[in-house]
Amino acid sequence: MELPPDAIPTPMPTVIDANDFTPRLLALLSNSLVWRESQVLRRRFGLGTNDWRVISAIAIRPGITASEISEFIVVNKAIVSKSVGVLGDRRLIVQVEDTGRSRQLFLTPAGAEMHDAMLPISMRGQEIILADLSPEEVDRLNALLRRLLSRVRELQAEDTLEDLRGPGPV
């Protein structure tokens, strides 16, 4: 195979350590769980992981708005809006006009039934990854993950402030 003259055929001298780069490991774990869950949910219910997350958020916080779901599950509002449309079309949720433009979301009886049918699939993923950990290790892991999430939120707030300030000198 002949490479173009501007192709770099060797690894870069400074790269992440793929075996010890924590964000990569977290992403691999998350992606693996999401892929498995998505396959099962699509096959059994014709719904995906994002739809499940929206159903779950509404089950946890009845009356939540799409914007609040977006913040709660940390996904783009467009993804939530698409799921809200799908779930509404399937009569799994209803929207109730709130003040202004926002709408509160509630499960219907069919939505509550769907939640209860989907829940074991999500819980199975948790069982799989935590099977070899003691209850104390699970508690420690969850505490560490909550700390990491808190740091990420701080970083996002810093980035937002930086974006508001505009570009610096070039």
Identify the function of each model-found stretch.
Residues 1-45, 170:
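N-terminal leader segment of winged-helix/HTH proteins
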Residues 24, 53, 139:
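Active-site phosphate/pyrophosphate-handling residues
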Residues 31, 35-79, 91, 160:
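N-terminal helix-turn-helix DNA-binding core of bacterial DNA-binding proteins
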Residues 26-30, 34, 73, 115, ...:
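Amphipathic, non-transmembrane alpha-helical scaffold segments
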Residues 5, 85-146:
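Charged, amphipathic alpha-helical coiled-coil/dimerization segments
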Residues 1-16, 136-170:
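C-terminal regulatory/oligomerization modules of transcriptional regulators
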